[in-house]
Amino acid sequence: MSTSKNYKWIIVALLFGVALLNYMDRQMISTMRPAMQIDIAELKQATNFGRLMAIFLWVYGAMSAFSGIIADRISRKWLIIGSLFVWSAVTFSMGYAETFNQLYVLRAIMGFSEALYIPAGLSLIADFHTDKTRSLAIGIHMSGIYMGQALGGFGSTVSKYYSWQNTFILFGLIGMLYAMVLILFLRDKKREITPASLGYQPNKNFFSGLASLLGSFPFWIIVLYFAVPSLPGWAIKNWAPTLIAENLKIDMSVAGPLTTISISISSLLGVIVGGILSDRWFQVNSRGRIYTGAIGLALTIPALFLMGYGVTVFHIIASAFLFGFGFGMFDTNNMPILCQFVQPNQRATGYGFLNTAGIFAGALITDYLGKSTDAGNLGKDFAMLAFVVVIVLIIQLIFLKPPKTNVLS
C-alpha cells in the first residue's frame, strides 16, 4: 500500500486521527476544571491549575528536541504508534486519579509521550508529499489538531453528565484502540538525502549534522518566528475559555465549547485556505509560503485585542474567527517553510527544536496567565500579546529569505 499513488493521502487521513487525539486528550482538562475541583480541592486555585497545565508543556518542550532527533533515526511508524498508545493509557489513568500530585505526575508523563508524535508525523507527511501538495497535506493534518481542540472543549459538557473520571477513561480507550489500527495500516518512507551536486552535503555524522542545522541563521529566524506566536497560541488554548466565561458571565460548560469550536472551525478553514494559497504562491515565488504565514499572523493581532476586551458574544466569535483563521494560515506553513531550508533527513530534528521553543513559550505564558487570572488582569494581558506578534512579523519579513533555487523538494 505504501507504494500506491494514493497512499500519500491515506497517510494524511491516518495521521489526522492521531493529531485529533493528540490535542483532544491534552485539551479536555482545560474545560473540566469546575468539575474536577469538586474532588480535587487544589484545582480551585487558578495558580495550581496553571501549574498542572504548565508541567505538561515543560516536559513536552524539553522532550520535543530529542523526539525530532529520534524520529530522524528510527522507524517513524513505531514511534508514532508507541507515542499514541502511551499517552492514551495516561489519559485512561487520569480517570482514576484522586489527588493533585497524581494528576501532576500523569500530566508530566503525557507531555513526554505526546512530544514524540508531532516531529515524526509531520516529517513523514512532508516526505510523502512534494512542494505541489505539501502545505495542503500539512494543513489537512493540522485540521485534525483543531478538531481535537474543538472536541476537547466538550470535555466540560461530557463530564457534567458522565463525570470527569469516565470522560478520561472513555477517550483513553479510544486512543489505545486506534493505535492497533495504525499497526495494520501505517507505513514509513525511506528518507532521501539531497545530492551533494545540488550544493548540500549529506551529514552522516550526527554531531556535524546537528552543528550544521544549529549553525544556520535562517533556522534560528524560523525558530523565533515559530516560538513567539506560540505565546498567544497557547494562551488561547489554555485560558480563553476562562477569559470568556468571566467576560460573558457564563458557565464553563458553555464557554468551553463556544471558545474551542469557534477557534477550531476557523482554524480548519485557515489551514485549508492557507495550504492551497501557499502551494500555488510557492510555484511562482519562493517566498510564497512565508508571505502566506505572515498574512495569517497579521490577522491574529486585532483578534487578540478583541478577545481581551470583548464583552459580547459577537466580540468573542469575531475575535475567535480572526485568530483561528489567521493562526491556521500560519500553522500550516511552518513545516513547509522549514523544508525550504533543511535537508529531508533533518526535518524531524528541525521541527523538534521548533516545537521545543514554541512549547517553552507556551509554558511561560500558561503559568503567567494563571497568576494574571488570580490578579484580575487576564483580559488586559491577552491584548498585550498582540505587540509581540507585531515584532516577530517584522523580523520574519525582513530576514527570512529562502534559497533562490529550491533543492529540498
Model-predicted segments: where are they?
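Helix-loop-helix hairpin linking two adjacent transmembrane segments in secondary transporters
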Residues: H141, I145-K189
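Helix-breaking motifs and short loop linkers at transmembrane-helix boundaries and internal kinks
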Residues: S75, Y96-Q102, T130, G310-V311
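Extracytoplasmic
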Residues: I10-E42, I236-P241
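Extracytoplasmic gate region of multi-pass secondary transporters
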Residues: I29-S30, S216-I272, D331, M335, ...
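Juxtamembrane intracellular "pre-TM" segments in multi-pass secondary transporters
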Residues: S2-S4, K190-I222, N247
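Cytoplasmic helix-loop-helix junction between adjacent transmembrane helices
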Residues: L106-G144
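Conserved MFS/SLC helix-loop-helix module at the cytosolic interface between two early adjacent transmembrane helices
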Residues: A62-E98
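Extracellular/periplasmic helix-loop-helix junction of adjacent transmembrane segments
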Residues: M32-A62
